[in-house]
Amino acid sequence: MFDKLMNSYYYGKSGKGDYTPDDLPKNRWQLFMEMLRTRMSGLCRMNLMYFVAWLPAMIAIALCVVSLIMTLAGTVQVDETGAVLDTIDQTALREAMQTSSDMIFVTLLILIPCIAITGPFTAGLSYVTRNWARDEHAFPWADYKDAIKANWKQGLLVSTITGCVPFLVYICWRFYGDMAVGNAVWVIPQMLILMLGILWALAVTYMYPMMVTYQMNFRTIIRNSFILAVGRLPGSVGIRLLHCVPTVLFTVIFLLTLQPWVLLLLFAYSLVFGFAFSRFITASFTNAVFDKYINSRIEGAQVNRGLSQENDDDDDDDDEQEEERELKPWENGYTDKH
């Protein structure tokens, strides 16, 4: 019985027709769901390997959250019976806010090296999930390791900047906020630095998939990523918000219930599936964006990988008669790595 089950798993059911090109997904959503179903176990394995890189950062964040909760809890007043009073000691509250601000400052400073070390590993995971998202083969360990070796320099640069951005934004936000108390003009640079931080967060969506897909120097990767982040602003914002859904959901449940098991569930989700699933969503999105705005403008680059395509000789003739198009900023003669 076990042999029959395994044969059915690897070779399919008897009497069922062979898989043909007509059976390929017709759109991106079908491709995403089919590849997610097929690669579910592989994503879990990749997540366990990738989680190690984020463990120092998660420990730093967890310690900061616990410290903030304990600090703010000290401002709550109770009576002799242990009942919570509605009044709050304003002096204790101001001291707690100052202490919390210092804790956040120190945590963001610690997170710079913690996030910096994740860059090469993120590049490796981006390569594997990129292939899986477009129905191509990738070995979970071998290709992950090779992609780390091939892209570790650019990955390290991106992650180092990513680690510094929250720290710099927080410092500038506090500085310009204090200045704005006496002069409202300082609100303008305060908002500008916040917008720059948000824009970097949107551009990072494209940086890792781009560095493992195209032969570009670091400056070109940064420029193209910002162009795509602004040009595809609704999609870029949507992907970033989608990544935040699990964390926000578990946080809201925790605040409503104050049950520690909620945070344990969030940790378990991140440990088993969360990081790889987030990268898989990003890969599916960036594959579509790259096909539309980059691959379609590179001679010989294949587009719509993993999707059903109708081969028509007339289309080839029409392509030969097309007028040469002007190169866009991201083309620059670069070709697909793989």
Model-assigned labels for residue ranges:
Residues 1-174, 186, 203-205, 210-220, ...:
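Helix-coil boundary and N-terminal low-complexity module in membrane systems
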Residues 175-182:
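Membrane-interface helix termini and inter-helical loops of multi-pass transporters
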Residues 188-197:
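Alpha-helical transmembrane segments of multi-pass membrane proteins
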